[in-house]
Amino acid sequence: MSSPDLLAKTPPPPYYAVIFTSRRTQGDRGYMRMADRMVELARQQPGFLAVESVRGADGLCITVSYWADKGSITAWKRHVEHQTAQCAGQRTWYSDYQVRVALVERDYGK
């Protein structure tokens, strides 16, 4: 995936986090190209704030995208190109996945 920020820079809360946890199937089959495109496209969407993504050696991946509001998340989920990627993911790229949406009420760090 094209270099998402390792530690996302977000505005002061509240905002929303979409947490996508997945385990990949074997082989690329166009995955990296599509993942790069989805990050590029998400960054262009109204309400998009940032994205962070990590993948472990065991294939477990956690991608967190941050959004200004629920309407922006819904619009992204319904985006035609994103829906195409979702279908391909369910059919080809993911052996397992879970999506969670959370309201960030507080954040802090160094």
Regions from the language model: what does each represent?
Residues G89-T92:
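Short, conserved catalytic or adaptor-binding loops enriched in Gly and charged residues
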Residues M1-C61, K70-R78, Y94-K110:
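Short S/T/G/P-rich N-terminal loop/turn motif that feeds into the first structured element of a domain
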